[in-house]
Amino acid sequence: MERETVYQNIALPMQCWKYSKEEIDKKVKELLELVGLTDKMNAKPRNLSGGQKQRVAIARALTMDPQILLCDEATSALDPKTTNSILDLLMEINQKIGITIVIVTHQMEVVRKACNKACILEHGKIADEGTVKDIFIKQPKSLRRLLGEEKVNLPKTGHNLQIAHMVNDLHDGELFGKMSSDLGYVFPILNGKIQEYQNESMGIFVINVDNEHFEKITEYLDKKQINWRELEVVDEEEEEEE
């Protein structure tokens, strides 16, 4: 409500349910402190930034002590810095209040930073669900369809394997060197990236393995319980026809 102050905006749900002025004042001031807007109590929405407006909306949603806080594309219109600050706030609220937070988003960085569990919806139905770590490690088809396959120039010979594993210390980063040493085989790394998941990091790499060593490599990965999948090579002509 553009004409009302931040205080009045947050107080509205409690006013509708006929809470006393004392109860409203106590609750609103507690929430203003929680979302970091105590100094904006008397400001009007037109004088707030996008991130501050989201903080007001979060505070207002918490006035009635809900069991679940639904955030529907809460960061979609915000810049990366503000997005991070809002996610930090939501994580802080989750820890302090113990409230369940459901985040609806198309931004995968939001899922990786703030969520413990995730489900992927396709045509109104749950296609896959699980912990965020498991979903991004296993890379189910629903996730790949959502993200769009990253184009990598893949060799047409041998086997192109995408490998995903957690990289939280120097030992984890030695996977490929140790695998090459253990198997006596040097393989090219075609692509690689590190993604952050709250306080953890996951590496996603693509390697090329010849036919002779394919079985040994995959057995090695399975024994180490490292997730892998073989990438399909699609000719550019076939892509154009599709």
Predicted regions and their residues:
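Short coil-to-helix segment of the ABC ATPase nucleotide-binding domain corresponding to the Q-loop/switch region
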Residues: E4-A11
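Conserved ABC ATPase "signature" region
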Residues: A11, Q15, E22-D39
